[in-house]
């Protein structure tokens, strides 16, 4: 395993990047295909650690699938309803929040004895609000170490009914319930307490659920109404669009040191909220050209921005790097949920930005960033967080280069990232 990657100063970027499949969509449709009636052909599936954890779990749960040699096409034979297991099993899910959270709800629909486990960071990522919601619907769930955190064991028992869910920690909790509750024995009404974070990710979930034949109504994201005793049905074939969060690094590179870069796989017809990043780039001064399935960014003078980025927390990290190349002070607001991601991203970003000379103020839920007078060559700690590694690769566009520690952490979502990044770069 590579301990570090030294990126030399890059003078210019230009070209086209074909994006890997979206992580958020890949793991959602793998699960939906598994519990739907019929066989689903998934194309442009993301090949990464997180999707592999989901595939491994589904196999242990009895799902039959055929994965192509390049791991981008998967034929999934749906079981037509909840998982029924006659014996106790344990599922290891690494640090894949997009796997453990939706699986917990689906596995709580039927009498089971299933342990959901993960790596050390997973044991620090909160899941208590989701567990509380499931218990309200009749589920029996036990914490195996610390209350509110994995590992956890579900015994089943979820029936539906009226559920109150905190919405201010992670949208994945609501996604988990939205996927499972159509299969519950009773109708379910989900009342959201507080402000719902990352609403575009809920839109992804609702869109995909509809593609699999189920429609869910809601009242301005405050109350969700789900009919029980439904069945998901295969759409036959589904092509996973490119990962919009991953697109942000290449679009940002063009804004800083283009040339122009075209990313394919996302565009005007994308269902992912993170395509909003391109609009933010345009507000900062870059030139953006949209097509149905591609976005092109061309360099222009960049100016600071002050914006609430709660709706695009992953792509907002890339804005923190753009701030270093922009005139003025950039403020990224309402991003408390950075603290419960793969690492505490607010703290990690502050520490690493200061290393390279930026002036940073870290608040409870915001970052204020002013560009450095001079960029300093630094070794960047990635905290085993794929997005830290990819974000800070852009420092190589500053003229001083950068050393990325533990670069292999990108395997969580984008194993070929550095290869693709260097392919559009000129030293």
From Swiss-Prot:
Main localization, broad class: cytoplasm
UniProt keywords, alphabetically: Amino-acid biosynthesis, Aromatic amino acid biosynthesis, Cytoplasm, Transferase
Reaction catalyzed: 3-phosphoshikimate + phosphoenolpyruvate = 5-O-(1-carboxyvinyl)-3-phosphoshikimate + phosphate
InterPro entries: Enolpyruvate_Tfrase_dom, Enolpyruvate_Tfrase_sf, EPSP_synthase, EPSP_synthase_CS, RNA3'P_cycl/enolpyr_Trfase_a/b
Record carries keyword Transferase: yes
Residues involved in 3-phosphoshikimate binding: 23-24, 28, 170-172, 198, 314, 337, 341
Active site residues according to the UniProt entry: 314
Cellular localization per UniProt: Cytoplasm
Residue intervals passing through the bilayer: none
Residues reported in the UniProt entry to bind phosphoenolpyruvate: 23, 97, 125, 172, 345, 387, 412
A single MF term (Gene Ontology): 3-phosphoshikimate 1-carboxyvinyltransferase activity
Protein's pathway: Metabolic intermediate biosynthesis; chorismate biosynthesis; chorismate from D-erythrose 4-phosphate and phosphoenolpyruvate: step 6/7
Any one of the GO BP annotations: amino acid biosynthetic process
EC number: 2.5.1.19
GO cellular component, one term: cytoplasm
Top EC group: transferase
Similarity field: Belongs to the EPSP synthase family.
Function, as annotated: Catalyzes the transfer of the enolpyruvyl moiety of phosphoenolpyruvate (PEP) to the 5-hydroxyl of shikimate-3-phosphate (S3P) to produce enolpyruvyl shikimate-3-phosphate and inorganic phosphate.
Assembly and oligomerization: Monomer.
Name of the protein described by the UniProt record: 3-phosphoshikimate 1-carboxyvinyltransferase
Source organism of the structure: Buchnera aphidicola subsp. Acyrthosiphon pisum (strain APS)
């Amino acid at each position: 395993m590579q301990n570090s990657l030294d990126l030399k100063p890059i003078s210019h970027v230009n070209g086209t990047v074909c994006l890997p499949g979206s992580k958020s969509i890949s793991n959602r449709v793998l699960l939906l295909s598994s519990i739907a009636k019929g066989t689903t052909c998934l194309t442009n599936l993301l090949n990464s650690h997180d999707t592999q954890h989901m595939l491994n779990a589904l196999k242990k749960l009895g799902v039959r699938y055929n994965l192509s040699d390049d791991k981008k096409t998967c034929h999934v034979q749906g079981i037509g309803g909840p998982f029924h297991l006659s014996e106790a099993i344990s599922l290891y899910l690494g640090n894949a929040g997009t796997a453990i959270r939706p699986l917990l709800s689906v596995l709580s629909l039927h009498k089971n004895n299933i342990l959901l486990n993960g790596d050390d960071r997973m044991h620090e990522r909160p899941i208590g609000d989701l567990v509380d919601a499931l218990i309200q619907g009749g589920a029996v769930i036990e914490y195996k170490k610390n209350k509110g955190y994995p590992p956890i064991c579900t015994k089943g028992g979820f029936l539906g009914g009226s559920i109150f869910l905190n919405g201010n920690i992670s949208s994945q909790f609501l996604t988990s319930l939205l996927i499972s509750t159509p299969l519950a024995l009773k109708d379910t009404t989900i009342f959201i307490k507080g402000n719902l974070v990352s609403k575009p990710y809920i839109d992804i979930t609702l869109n995909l659920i509809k593609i699999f034949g189920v429609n869910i109504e809601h009242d301005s994201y405050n109350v969700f109404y789900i009919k029980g005793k439904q069945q998901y049905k295969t759409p036959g074939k589904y092509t996973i669009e490119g990962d919009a969060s991953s697109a942000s690094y290449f679009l940002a590179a063009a804004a800083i040191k283009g040339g122009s870069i075209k990313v394919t796989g996302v565009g005007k017809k994308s269902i992912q909220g993170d395509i909003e990043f391109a609009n933010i780039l345009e507000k900062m001064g870059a030139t953006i050209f949209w097509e149905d399935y591609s976005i092109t960014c061309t360099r222009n003078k960049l100016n600071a921005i002050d914006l609430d980025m709660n709706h695009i927390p992953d792509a907002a990290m890339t804005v923190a790097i753009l701030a270093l190349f922009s005139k003025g002070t950039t403020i990224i607001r309402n991003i408390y949920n950075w603290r419960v991601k793969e690492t505490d991203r607010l703290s990690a970003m502050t520490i690493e930005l200061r290393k390279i000379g930026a002036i940073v103020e870290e608040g409870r839920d915001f970052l204020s960033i002013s560009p450095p007078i001079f960029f300093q060559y630094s070794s960047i700690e990635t905290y085993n967080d794929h997005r830290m590694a990819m974000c800070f690769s852009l420092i190589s566009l500053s003229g001083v280069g950068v050393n990325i520690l533990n670069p292999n952490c990108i395997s969580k979502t984008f194993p070929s990232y550095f290869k693709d990044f260097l392919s559009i770069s000129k030293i």
